Regions:
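Intrinsically disordered, low-complexity regions enriched in small/polar residues
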Residues: 17, 22, 38-40, 55, ...
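Intrinsically disordered, low-complexity regions
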Residues: 6, 19, 27, 46, ...
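A short, structured beta-strand/loop element
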Residues: 34-78
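Mixed-charge, Lys/Arg-enriched low-complexity segments
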Residues: 59-115
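Generic hydrophobic, helix-prone segments enriched in Leu/Val/Ile
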Residues: 9, 53-54, 96
């Protein structure tokens, strides 16, 4: 998995979604070439390592204020969309939870905010 190179980050939100824990990080310093605004890490049960990451990272080609959402999983990664909305914590979190629910087939589960 080509996971984000997080050096330091501040947890901004934490959710429970079924058997999964979702943590949204902000103020990210990384050791890769990406400029992250937010990262959602998805952990299943007691597994110490996230199995899925969703990132909002600055799109250098599209100009100021546009962020790409990148999905990173064990079998690869892909940019799945771009939006200026994802500079906002709540907009990013809502969209990331929707995507995680869809990928993991958790449509019947309600996210429970823990932080």
């Amino acid at each position: 998995m080509n996971k984000p190179g997080i050096v330091t980050a501040i947890p901004r939100r934490r959710y429970r979604l079924g058997e999964f824990s979702l943590v949204v990080l902000g103020e990210i310093e990384s050791n890769d070439d990406r400029d992250y605004r937010y990262i959602m890490a998805v952990v299943q049960g007691d597994d110490p390592q996230p199995g899925i990451y969703l990132t909002a990272e600055r799109n250098r080609e599209a100009g100021h204020g546009i962020f790409d959402m990148r999905l990173v999983m064990r079998d690869g990664e892909d940019v799945i969309g771009s939006s200026a909305d994802w500079q906002d914590l709540d907009a990013f979190t809502d969209e990331a939870i929707r995507i995680v629910s869809q990928i993991l087939n958790l449509g019947d589960e309600e996210p429970y905010r823990m932080m």
